[in-house]
């Protein structure tokens, strides 16, 4: 027999506060509205989000989808009690995976799960998601907030993101004409981005430093703040370069697995990327991680971006035009190497020179 009357249980007694959920929705509505774009101008709160491809200017589009998370970088945000930027990371990890296929990000949805919903914390997280969406030019058209007592400890949370983009048919990347001798350009990262943070946290533990300690590699910043520097969003500069020059043959987002795992994903089997490690300008954060953790260069390269967040492949005659277009949008461009012939069974990424860590 179910309980009734004044002693009956409520959902709140079980740890789920519907009123807090409703309060969060009201808090985030202005941030969500700020992401509206052609094709998406609805309000959140419906059973699903809508997007009008024709209103967005597409005629014969191919849809491209990606989903990702932020990983254990969230643990630093939780422990440091700084939640404003992890939403940017969430968007970046998804939309950067869209643009490498030549697609314009159109809309984004998030999943936010927590042990106990704190509206101000949730609003900070979603505010970051909205900021990332604005930077990428995509609309935040919906999401799910799940308060899950017993699944997560109070204060803990996890994030997942889902992005959909589009490219006109025939405009997808990589192109089919990547050739031996093509030049490999690298775009600078903003820091560690959102990969390798289990190793980062282990190194910080070994260092004995707290998240509020001065960052040894970033003057004027606390350690937690410096490590939480959000992932760079490359969407608008790359889309502009694609449209202005028509010369980009391939793009690779340097995430987990670094150069050796990510670059070969966009190459034909008969070609490999030869990277001059001496050309990589390694930011101080990576030097500190390598030195403090005793991490060898090979392990750094397969775990972190080491200062290069995006790879661009172009024909040699187009290097100047593509570099100029990207630099005009604020990107730091460096020539990293060339495409070379690859023997059957050989690695898709090979190195020359030494990584200066």
Curated annotation (Swiss-Prot):
**Catalysed reaction(s)?**
2-formamido-N(1)-(5-O-phospho-beta-D-ribosyl)acetamidine + ATP = 5-amino-1-(5-phospho-beta-D-ribosyl)imidazole + ADP + phosphate + H(+)
Top-level EC class, please?
ligase
GO molecular function terms attached to this record = ATP binding; phosphoribosylamine-glycine ligase activity; phosphoribosylformylglycinamidine cyclo-ligase activity
* Enzyme Commission number, as recorded: 6.3.3.1
Task: Tell me the superkingdom of the source.
Answer: Bacteria
Please name the pathway.
Purine metabolism; IMP biosynthesis via de novo pathway; 5-amino-1-(5-phospho-D-ribosyl)imidazole from N(2)-formyl-N(1)-(5-phospho-D-ribosyl)glycinamide: step 2/2
Would you tell me the protein name for this molecule?
A: Phosphoribosylformylglycinamidine cyclo-ligase
Q: Where in the cell is it found?
A: Cytoplasm
> Its family?
Belongs to the AIR synthase family.
Alphabetical list of Pfam families matching this protein = AIRS, AIRS_C
Which InterPro entries has this protein been placed in? Answer: PurM-like_C_dom, PurM-like_C_sf, PurM-like_N, PurM-like_N_sf, PurM_cligase
Q: For this chain's UniProt record, which GO biological process terms are given?
A: 'de novo' IMP biosynthetic process; adenine biosynthetic process
């Amino acid at each position: 027999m179910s309980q009734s009357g004044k002693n009956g249980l409520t959902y709140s007694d079980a740890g789920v506060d519907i009123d807090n959920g409703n309060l969060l929705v009201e808090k985030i509505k202005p941030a969500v509205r700020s992401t509206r774009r052609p094709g998406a101008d609805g309000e959140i709160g419906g059973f699903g989000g809508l997007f009008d491809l024709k209103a967005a200017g597409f005629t014969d589009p191919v849809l491209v989808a990606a989903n990702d998370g932020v990983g254990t970088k969230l643990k630093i945000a939780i422990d440091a009690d700084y939640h404003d930027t992890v939403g940017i990371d969430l968007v970046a990890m998804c939309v950067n995976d869209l643009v490498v296929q030549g697609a314009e990000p159109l809309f984004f949805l998030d999943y936010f799960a927590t042990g106990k919903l704190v509206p101000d914390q949730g609003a900070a997280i979603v505010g970051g998601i909205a900021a990332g969406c604005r930077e990428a030019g995509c609309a935040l058209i919906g999401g799910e907030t799940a308060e899950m007592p017993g699944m997560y400890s109070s204060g803990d949370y996890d994030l997942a993101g889902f992005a959909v983009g589009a490219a006109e048919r025939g405009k997808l990347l990589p192109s089919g004409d990547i050739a031996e001798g093509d030049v490999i350009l690298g775009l600078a990262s903003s820091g560690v981005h959102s990969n390798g943070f289990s190793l980062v946290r282990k190194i910080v533990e070994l260092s004995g430093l707290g998240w509020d300690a001065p960052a040894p590699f970033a003057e004027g910043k606390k350690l937690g703040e410096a490590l939480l520097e959000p992932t760079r969003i490359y969407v608008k500069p790359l889309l502009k370069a694609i449209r202005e020059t028509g010369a980009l043959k391939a793009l690779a987002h340097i995430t987990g697995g670094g150069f050796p795992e990510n670059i070969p994903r966009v190459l034909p089997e008969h070609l490999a990327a030869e990277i001059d490690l001496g050309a990589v300008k390694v930011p101080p954060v990576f030097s500190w991680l390598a030195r403090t953790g005793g991490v060898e260069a090979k392990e750094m390269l397969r775990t972190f971006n080491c200062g290069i967040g995006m790879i661009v492949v172009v024909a040699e005659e187009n290097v100047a035009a593509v570099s100029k277009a990207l630099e005009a949008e604020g990107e730091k461009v460096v020539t990293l190497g060339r495409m070379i012939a690859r023997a059957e069974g050989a690695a898709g990424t090979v190195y020359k020179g030494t990584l200066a860590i």
